[in-house]
Amino acid sequence: MSDGSKYGWGNNRSIILMKSKDLIHWTSSRFDVAAAFPQLGDIRCAWAPQTYYDPAEKKLFVYFTIGIVGGQNKLYYSYTDEDFTKLVTEPKLLGFDPPMDHTYIDGDISLVNGTYHLFTSDNGIKHAESKSLLSGYKYVSNENCAKVGGGVEAPTLWRRFGTDKYVLMYDNFSQPNEMAFSETTDFREFKNLDRFNKGVMKAANFSGAKHGAVIWLTKDEADALAKHWNLKDY
């Protein structure tokens, strides 16, 4: 649901929950966050959802940005039903220690060697750590992990196969829009890999991507996708 006249350009107040058993055939459900949780206030945006599994609760949760009229945009989380069609718990703030008193959006969580790493869009791409999944996050430093100039948002992290190198991808929305990359081995120093097709990262058949994510595939999954989309070389 959106209302541009009341909430401005960033007025999407619903999220889409999608699921698939083969990454080819998908089902989706639209969930109206604002209508479901009026107790939070007048929600003006629900942005950039991601999903994570909570091993303690043995449940999936969605963490995403919520903006409330008269307030700041911050990261919240809410558990889903078993069918992954709706949120079933009131969204709570993804916990920083101490609590953050300014806007931070577009979270990405990864567990590496017993530490949870949270990257957010906060006047650049910032990096926080915690030993707990949903609380206790602290920024490691005020460093901007994005090394390409211009506006940045929507970080996502993955490990290169067979290495100790982690790639941080983010949306570099300066004109023209494109994904950009940093690389780290210690989560303290981040090396600039530049934008798609300006460095080692290549985009073969698309451009201008936004808010991307990367997941690992088995060979069987990759082969099935290549066959479905008629990809000769991948």
Residue ranges of model-derived segments:
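Carbohydrate-active catalytic/glycan-binding domains of CAZyme proteins
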Residues: 1-234
